[in-house]
């Protein structure tokens, strides 16, 4: 359902899409199912460039598995490791992935919050000088940076702010280098309200202001923005509302069709917000 909604949204705005698969997704199903689902989507949406990406690979072995499955790109997340260990594991992944024509995203700095297999209690902002050294020594193709975003639906207790001063300093040291923002869901309140109204409990959920995200991708070198939480909220709010109003329904296709449509609309809106339209 998620994949179909993403592909439909990308088709509507004539945009390429990066479809991220987490270690949790591999644990939930299996590698053959993941690969088969993606290959089927590419056949069904031949006019939409869909790129398969491993999100938050925690080890060389996990990244190697994704490379061997012909993923287009992998992320090695050594952000919780000491700097030198992060460099070593990232360089090992880069060497293997590049030999197979696969791009590598790495991460430096720590994002607070919980999402899938990623958990941290506080933010550790990316050090610009360390970022420059890290990219030079590892040869990673993109770098996820920590400038104030966080994983999950509860990103800010007060005013939502991002450290654009840190981002600008990183860009001075890495001119024209593609950077990534994780934990950048805006947590639309319309979804939060529907979930809470129909039996859920996500009170206090708060995301990143979309105006800040617009600035990040339109005025800075942020080329990839991760918004998984928003997709989850779109799906869950639609399903909860439908089942509450149709308690006798046992046909999954009825509420999944509605959820796919909502995901499609959300993805299309994100593409417009991030100026990712008419690119194919």
Question: What residue spans do the PLM features occupy?
Answer:
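Alpha/beta enzyme core
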Residues: 1-25, 32-47, 51, 56-178, ...
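Shared catalytic-loop signature of beta/alpha-barrel
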Residues: 19, 26-30, 213-214, 223-246, ...
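Hydrophobic alpha-helical scaffolding
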Residues: 27, 124, 202-206, 225, ...
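Generic long, charged, amphipathic alpha-helical segments
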Residues: 180-183
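Extended, intrinsically disordered, low-complexity segments
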Residues: 237-280
């Amino acid at each position: 359902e998620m994949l179909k909604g993403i592909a439909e949204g990308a088709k509507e705005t004539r945009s390429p899409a990066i479809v991220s698969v987490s270690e949790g997704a591999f644990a939930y199903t299996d590698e053959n199912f993941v690969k088969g689902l993606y290959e089927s989507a590419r056949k069904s949406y031949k006019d939409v460039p869909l790129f398969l990406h491993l999100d938050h690979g925690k080890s060389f072995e996990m990244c190697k598995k994704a490379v061997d499955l012909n993923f287009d790109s992998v992320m090695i997340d050594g952000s919780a490791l000491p700097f030198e260990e992060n460099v070593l594991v990232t360089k090992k992944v880069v060497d293997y992935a590049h030999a197979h024509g696969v791009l590598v995203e790495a991460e430096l700095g720590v994002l607070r919050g919980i999402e899938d297999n990623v958990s941290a209690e506080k933010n550790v902002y990316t050090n610009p000088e360390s970022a420059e050294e890290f990219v030079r020594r590892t040869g990673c193709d993109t770098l996820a940076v920590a400038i104030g975003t966080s994983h999950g639906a509860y990103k800010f207790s007060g005013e939502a702010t991002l450290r654009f001063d840190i981002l600008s300093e990183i860009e001075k040291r890495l001119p024209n280098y593609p950077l990534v923002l994780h934990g950048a869901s805006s947590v639309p309140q319309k979804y939060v309200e529907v979930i809470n109204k129909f039996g859920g409990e996500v009170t206090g959920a708060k995301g990143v202001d979309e105006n800040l995200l617009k600035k990040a991708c339109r005025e800075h070198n942020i080329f990839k923005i991760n918004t998984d939480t928003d997709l989850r909220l779109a799906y869950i709010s639609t399903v909860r509302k439908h089942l509450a109003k149709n308690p006798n329904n046992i046909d999954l296709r009825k509420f999944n069709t509605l959820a796919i449509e909502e995901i499609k609309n959300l993805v299309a809106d994100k593409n417009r917000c991030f100026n990712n339209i008419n690119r194919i």
